[in-house]
Amino acid sequence: MKKILSTLLMLGMSSLTFANSQQVVEQLQKMGLSGVEVSDSPVKGIKTAVTDNGIFYITEDAKYILDGKLYALSEKGLRDVSSSLLLDKLTAYKNEMVVYPAKDEKHVITVFMDTSCHYCKVLHKQIKEYNDLGITVRYLAFPRGGVQSKTAREMEAIFTAQDPQFALTEAINGNPPKTLKDANITKKHYQLGLQFGVNGTPSIVTEKGELIGGYLKPADLLSELAQ
């Protein structure tokens, strides 16, 4: 990512003279960005480029590119506009998630997690408390060591197990699966996490697509979601 961004900044996009979205896509692909989808942003004069490498913002004259989050200001504070663009992709993976549903559901969160992560374990061991507060918890895999790591292969076995809920809880309690699998589902989850800007676990995505980095106690998370 840093190498790609450095290339973009050095070029400054000043040499680009494209006038439509397809030309934007082609130029960004030449610079090493993949899966590029260009659309209008909420900001006049700025285009949004959703890529496998993250989200970028490009001025319509194609002279500047911005890397980072875009927030909308409101009376309630800041709203993460960038992550909300990825909600459709998140929904596409709903059948690959390990889900712990709340009986009286009020909120749904999606957690990018790593079974070797201390605070992911803390969060999971409180799963009943989250559920009792009306919070449904959905997990996606985000092995911090990358998709070639042992943890990635363990998580692949968990997410494809006959009973993923049981397999995940067992792993959290120190009993990981004995048979490992090459990352497939895990790889897709990891890539989506990168698009959301996940750089650590647990990372929580709200129903609005906003990213909350780090662990929050059940009551604190409920307060955050109610805002």
From Swiss-Prot:
Superkingdom in the source lineage: Bacteria
Keyword Disulfide bond found: yes
Disulfide bonds: 117-120
Cellular localization per UniProt: Periplasm
Major localization class: periplasm
SUPFAM superfamilies xref list: DsbC/DsbG N-terminal domain-like, Thioredoxin-like
Any Pfam family the entry gives: DsbC_N
One GO CC term, this protein: periplasmic space
Entry keywords, A to Z: Disulfide bond, Periplasm, Redox-active center, Signal
Keyword Metal-binding on entry: no
TM annotation in the entry: none
Leader sequence residues: 1-19
Subunit structure comment from the entry: Homodimer.
Annotated function: Required for disulfide bond formation in some periplasmic proteins. Acts by transferring its disulfide bond to other proteins and is reduced in the process. DsbC is reoxidized by a yet uncharacterized protein. Also acts as a disulfide isomerase.
Family: Belongs to the thioredoxin family. DsbC subfamily.
PANTHER family: THIOL:DISULFIDE INTERCHANGE PROTEIN DSBC, THIOL:DISULFIDE INTERCHANGE PROTEIN DSBC-RELATED
Name by which UniProt lists this protein: Thiol:disulfide interchange protein DsbC
Lineage: Bacteria, Pseudomonadati, Pseudomonadota, Gammaproteobacteria, Pasteurellales
